[in-house]
Amino acid sequence: TISVIDLVAQKEIHRLDLGTLRRPHGLAVFDGKLYFTCEVNKIIGRYDPATNQIDWLLGTGQDQTHMIELSRDGSQIYTANIAGNTISIIGRTGEANWLVTSIPVGKGPEGFDVTPDGKELWAAGSRDGSVSEIDIANKRLIRTFNVQTKRSNRLRFTPDGRLVLISDPDAGDLLILDRETRKDLKRIKLGSQPAGILIPPDGARAYVAVTGDNNIAVIDLKTFDLVDRISTGQNPDGMAWVK
């Protein structure tokens, strides 16, 4: 199922039954519609809340299609396919036609992000401590390098594109990399199972969901210090910024 939440009332207002579409995971919103993955079916779908209908489905052909993002203009969709060890770039080729290009990367790609200039996609391998860089325009792997994580979960760029943040639940760390040099700047101990990463548009702080400790760690991105913790419900993970 997919739940629709009223953010003002802070309650669920609708629950969409996906039927035979199993294990939904990644979510992304574009032009008022919700794009989602279903890992078991190897597909991405689109839900229109105005009509309460799933109005589009597309197979990726890749095992365990997990996370999803769209380009700013909606002309491309990106997915991480964990068991397939690939990143898919899905480009619109006509009014209703899409071309799926799947690029082999490190083992177990899960967290990924697109650089602020839209030119590259970086994906973290959850099973081998790798980061893979992809040239989006040419749909090719640039390089893969190792960041020595135990299990990378999420990867995020700061808005200026200078820093790369990677959460490592098994080590309890947040890794901060310099994008240009690919060198470690700091590894911050956050607690039990840090996972989701949220960086607001001003880039001043990072919010990291510490799943096992039921809180969100707040990191100052100038000093790289842990400056606050926000208590949450049980097992926080994914987060979103509401404008």
Give the predicted meaning of each segment.
Residues 1-243:
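Predominantly soluble domains enriched in secretory-pathway, periplasmic, or organellar proteins
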